[in-house]
Amino acid sequence: MVFPIGDDNTGRTRTPYITYLLIALNVLVFVFLQGLGTNEQFTYAFSTVPQEIRTGEDVARPVRIEVGDQSGTIPLQPTPGSVYLTLLVSMFMHGSLMHLLGNMLFLWIFGDNIEDDLGHGRFTSFYLATGILASLAHVISTFTFGDNPFIPSLGASGAISGVMGGYLVMHPHRRVRVIMLRMLTEVPGYVAVGLWFLFQLISAFGVIGQGPQSGGGVAFMAHIGGFIAGAVLVKLFAVGSRPAARR
């Protein structure tokens, strides 16, 4: 397992204001709107529910969920406005403090480089677009593989996966500091990001048809969808922007 903890930012010329702002927004939403995870009414109102996205109709009632030999009830809440708003809002919410910290670490490592490539405005659009596409990938896979469509999803990892897909394309040889086999070392970006993506693929195929809860609550298809979207779209978003100083 390879765990990134930083990278070489030599050649970066822009201060990554948007990356810092996104990190701040995620923290503020978790602390003040989600009440550090205790405000279930807000969390279940704005999480993305595949059934709602498919039908366009809000599901505001307790829903019984069964995963393997375990079962429980999810108290889905009414969503103010359109249910499609959850595709955007849910990417700023998290299920736990560790969920938040892990995502923000990856955004801090990889986001600044892509923001430097695209510029502040384009990076904002790129981040939001890949996040929404990641959520849609999760929705589509839910119905394709017969997972429970009432299980809500949330988190910035889909958008951050998009950033990592862009990083693989734009910075394949940039040195990334990682913890690998309990040792601190540096590897090229294509190794760090490529191994991460390989893990997502293996994990996704292991839980297909069993729902995200069987994979520890991780929506792996959102990660895969966001990553592919980022890898495909980053050059399009970079058209017309100045080239990054170093790859």
Predicted region positions:
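A detector for small-residue-rich transmembrane helices and their helix-helix packing motifs
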Residues: 1-247
